């Protein structure tokens, strides 16, 4: 992961932006479609001489910001590991997703920041990425049709449902529609409001051919809306084959402490303890 550029999609699940308190940042944005994502932000750009150059992936812990007044929430997402193709003008022409996985795009909520990315890479352990699951074909009818994403938080020794249990097909933009949108943002997104122009990152890194895209967070359940991460909390985000596992089975794996102690096919998870 350390050599991959990492980007995140803003607003690809109905209701999440409003819950996260970020919708005001995009009130002036014009979209061709009502439910289109709002933009693409960088969360990790290797060797950048700023906070974005800090490797922020840790699959075992979340390190909270040093300022104790900053409030952080987990963001349950799916990430895609993609090959990136360019034309002779170095415009992105194609994204080829090879793997998908559970992802935690933990974010600061109350930081006064010019750019959304400043709320994303807040420590050396502000993101988490699960086991890679191979993609047979990233089209309707492929393996992703059969997967859902669930998330949980353990607080005071009790597991709580964190985000909505959601099929991946509930993403507003998915499959080729999502890939085309990401391609367009990489090529043409301009600096404005809380988003950066992205092409300069690609230019400075000699047009990299591997990237990770976190494709948007699920809406929160009531507990998660009111609870900000505290030291000792345990966060779990799971992408699972819902033809093989019921939601209740996933819950039982946590309650029985069997998620990390046994091998599980067709399942990708992030399990982090908050420090």
Regions found by a protein language model. Name each.
Residues 149-152, 233-239:
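Short conserved beta-strand and strand-loop elements enriched in small hydrophobics
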Residues 2-205, 227, 249-275:
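Glycine-enriched loop-and-adjacent helix/strand subsegments that border the catalytic/binding cleft
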Residues 14, 217-222, 240-245:
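Short, charged beta-turn/beta-strand-edge "cap" motif at the junction between a beta-strand
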Residues 9-11, 209-221:
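Glycine-rich beta-strand-to-loop/alpha-helix junction loops that act as flexible
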Residues 223-230:
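Short glycine/threonine-rich loop-to-helix capping motif typified by GTGT followed
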Residues 208-210, 230-236:
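Loop/turn positions that initiate beta-strands
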């Amino acid at each position: 992961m350390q050599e991959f550029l990492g980007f995140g999609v803003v607003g690809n699940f109905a209701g999440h932006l409003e819950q996260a308190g970020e919708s005001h940042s995009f009130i002036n944005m014009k979209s061709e479609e009502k439910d289109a994502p709002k933009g693409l932000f960088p969360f990790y750009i290797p060797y950048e001489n700023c906070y974005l150059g800090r490797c922020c992936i840790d699959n075992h812990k979340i390190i909270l910001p040093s300022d104790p007044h900053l409030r952080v929430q987990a963001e349950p997402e799916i990430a895609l590991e993609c090959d990136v193709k360019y034309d002779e003008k170095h415009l992105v022409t194609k994204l080829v997703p090879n793997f998908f996985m559970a992802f935690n795009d933990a974010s600061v909520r109350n930081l006064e920041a010019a750019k959304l990315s400043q709320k994303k890479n807040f420590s050396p352990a502000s993101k988490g990425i699960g086991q890679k699951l191979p993609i047979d074909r990233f089209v309707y009818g492929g393996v992703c049709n059969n997967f859902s994403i669930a998330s949980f938080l353990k607080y005071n020794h009790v597991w709580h449902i964190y985000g909505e249990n959601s099929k991946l097909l509930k993403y507003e933009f998915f499959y080729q529609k999502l890939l085309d949108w990401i391609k367009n943002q990489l090529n043409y997104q301009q600096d404005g409001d809380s988003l950066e122009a992205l092409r300069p990152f690609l230019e400075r890194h000699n047009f990299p051919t591997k990237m990770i895209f976190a494709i948007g967070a699920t809406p929160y359940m009531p507990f998660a809306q009111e609870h900000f991460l505290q030291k000792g909390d345990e966060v779990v985000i799971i992408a699972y084959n819902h033809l093989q596992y019921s939601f209740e089975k996933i819950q039982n794996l946590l309650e029985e402490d069997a998620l990390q102690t046994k091998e599980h096919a067709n399942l990708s998870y992030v399990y982090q303890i908050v420090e």
